[in-house]
Amino acid sequence: MSERVFAELATIHYQKSLPCRHSFDPPRTTPILHLYIIHLLLPPLIAIVCLCYIAIVPFEEEEERMRMQVVETAAVEEEEAAAAMMSVYERVARMASGNAVVVFSASGCCMCHVVKRLLLGLGVGPAVYELDQLAAAADIQAALSQLLPPGQPPVPVVFVGGRLLGGVEKVMACHINGTLVPLLKQAGALWL
């Protein structure tokens, strides 16, 4: 090795050991300082994230409940007592004409959830009758099944303007081909 190369290597080694502003080495701080910073900043960040989650999630659920006019169980029971004399078909017709958009649903049904979310996304606040929470659910569901074409699932059943629109397949087909919004406007469920 020549003396010149050796001198250059010694100079580079010496310069690396000196503190330099243009160094590509990571800044030299003690690990204790990093732990202290993490110890100070992490709990407030976790608290902020938790508070945001706690504040936002119930707000979204409450907003959804406010937009969707869910028929309360007590009101439904009053209606059931008053409608005991009527036939099941008259009762379904009365329930279906009570609002611009009415959805007969089951609380655990994923397709019912899809239909309700679609209508809410369009800006419609449907009246929702959860059949699994009604006392006369079996009679109402039997009447709805006779109104639907054979092979259709019993829920969801959507009425627009007091007239039967259909189940989830019909609602989605109308949405895709662009006829759902005009139907909702004609029924008075949408103003825009």
Swiss-Prot record:
It comes from the Eukaryota. Disulfide bonds join C109-C112. It is found in: Cytoplasm; Nucleus. A motif (Responsive for interaction with TGA factors) lies at residues 189-192. Residues 89-191 form the Glutaredoxin domain. The keyword Electron transport applies. GO terms for cellular component: cytoplasm; nucleus. It holds the Pfam family Glutaredoxin. Keywords: Cytoplasm, Disulfide bond, Electron transport, Nucleus, Redox-active center, Transport. NCBIfam families: GlrX-like_plant. Belongs to the glutaredoxin family. CC-type subfamily. Has a glutathione-disulfide oxidoreductase activity in the presence of NADPH and glutathione reductase. Reduces low molecular weight disulfides and proteins. This is Glutaredoxin-C9. It comes from Oryza sativa subsp. japonica. The lineage of its organism: Eukaryota, Viridiplantae, Streptophyta, Embryophyta, Tracheophyta. The gene is GRXC9.
